[in-house]
C-alpha cells in the first residue's frame, strides 16, 4: 500500500505558530518606536502652536501700546470664572462697573483675546501632550448663534480647552514689550495646579539641583518641577522676544527664576519659590508667574 507523500509546505497551524513567534520578536521593537515617534510629533506640534501664539501676542501688543493680552478692564482681578463668557458686551462678560473697571477674569480669557482679535484658532491652544484637554467648540455648550470671535473665553470651564500657562496679566506686573526680551510669558501647563488629567504635583518632591543658584537637590528632584505633559523631561517656554525653547528645568527665567512659582524675593527671580493658587501675583518685575485656571468640577 502506498503512503501519501507529505507536502513540503507548512500546515495552517504551523503558519500561525511561526507568525506568533515573529510577532513576539517584532512587536517589542515596533511599539516603542511608534510611541517615540508619536511623542516627537506631539512635541513638535506643541512647540509650533506656542510659537504661533507668541507671534499673535506680539501682533496684539503692536495694536495696544506694547501691552500683552489682558482681559477685562482697569483693576480687573484673576477670578475662577467670567461673569458670562458668552455675553453680548465686555462689561457683562467681566462684571465691570459703569466706569468699565473692576470685575474678574480668568487667565485664559486674556489668551482668548487672540481668538477674538488676531484670528488664532482655539485648536492652537491645545497641546496633544496635555491629557484631558480638547478643542473648544461653542456648540458643545449650546452656543450655536455666535461665532468664536464673539465670545470671551474657552467656555465656563476653560481649563479643559486651554493647555498653556500664561504670565498673570492682572495687577502691577502685567507684561509689556518693555520687559526684558528673555522674560518667560507662556509655557506648558503649570505642574503645581490641578489639571483636567489629575491633581497638582506635591511641591515637597521638588528641589532645584546644582544648575541653579544655591541648588542642592538631585537631578530627579529637579525634574519633578517640570511640566507633566513631557514625562518630566522639561517644558516648552515662550519668551517675550517670540522664541520658543524646550527648557529642561523650570527655573529658566530671569535670575534663574522658576516660571511656575512665586518668587520669595521682592527684587529678583527664585529657582524654588512657592506654588501659586487662584489670585496669586508675581513678587516683582523679574518674576515670571505662568499659571492656569482651576478646573471646574
List the predicted regions and their residue ranges.
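Amphipathic alpha-helical segments typified by the pilin-like N-terminal helix
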Residues: 2, 6-48
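Short, well-structured segments within or immediately adjacent to enzyme catalytic domains
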Residues: 42-297
Amino acid at each position: 500500500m502506498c503512503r501519501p507523500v507529505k507536502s513540503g509546505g507548512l500546515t495552517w497551524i504551523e503558519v500561525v505558530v511561526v507568525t506568533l513567534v515573529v510577532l513576539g520578536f517584532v512587536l517589542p521593537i515596533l511599539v516603542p518606536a511608534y510611541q517615540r515617534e508619536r511623542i516627537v510629533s506631539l512635541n513638535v506640534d506643541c512647540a509650533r502652536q506656542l510659537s504661533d501664539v507668541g507671534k499673535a501676542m506680539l501682533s496684539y501688543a503692536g495694536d495696544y501700546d506694547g501691552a500683552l493680552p489682558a482681559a477685562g478692564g482697569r483693576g480687573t482681578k484673576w477670578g475662577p470664572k467670567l461673569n458670562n463668557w458668552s455675553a453680548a458686551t465686555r462689561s457683562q462678560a467681566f462684571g465691570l462697573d459703569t466706569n468699565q473697571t473692576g470685575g474678574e477674569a480668568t487667565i485664559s480669557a486674556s489668551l482668548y483675546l487672540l481668538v477674538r482679535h488676531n484670528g488664532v484658532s482655539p485648536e492652537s491652544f491645545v497641546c496633544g501632550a496635555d491629557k484631558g484637554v480638547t478643542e473648544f467648540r461653542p456648540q458643545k455648550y449650546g452656543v450655536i448663534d455666535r461665532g468664536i470671535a464673539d465670545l470671551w473665553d474657552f467656555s465656563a470651564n476653560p481649563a479643559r480647552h486651554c493647555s498653556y500657562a500664561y504670565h498673570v496679566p492682572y495687577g502691577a506686573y502685567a507684561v509689556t514689550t518693555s520687559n526684558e526680551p528673555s522674560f518667560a510669558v507662556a509655557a506648558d501647563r503649570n505642574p503645581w495646579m490641578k489639571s483636567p488629567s489629575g491633581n497638582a504635583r506635591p511641591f515637597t518632591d521638588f528641589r532645584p539641583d546644582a544648575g541653579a543658584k544655591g541648588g542642592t537637590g538631585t537631578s530627579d528632584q529637579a525634574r519633578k518641577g517640570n511640566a507633566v505633559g513631557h514625562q518630566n523631561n522639561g517644558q516648552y517656554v515662550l519668551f517675550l522676544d517670540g522664541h520658543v525653547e524646550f527648557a529642561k528645568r523650570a527655573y529658566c527665567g530671569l535670575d534663574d527664576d522658576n516660571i511656575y512659582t512665586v518668587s520669595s524675593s521682592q527684587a529678583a527671580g527664585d529657582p524654588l519659590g512657592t506654588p501659586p493658587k487662584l489670585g496669586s501675583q508675581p513678587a516683582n518685575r523679574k518674576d515670571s508667574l505662568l499659571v492656569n485656571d482651576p478646573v471646574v468640577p
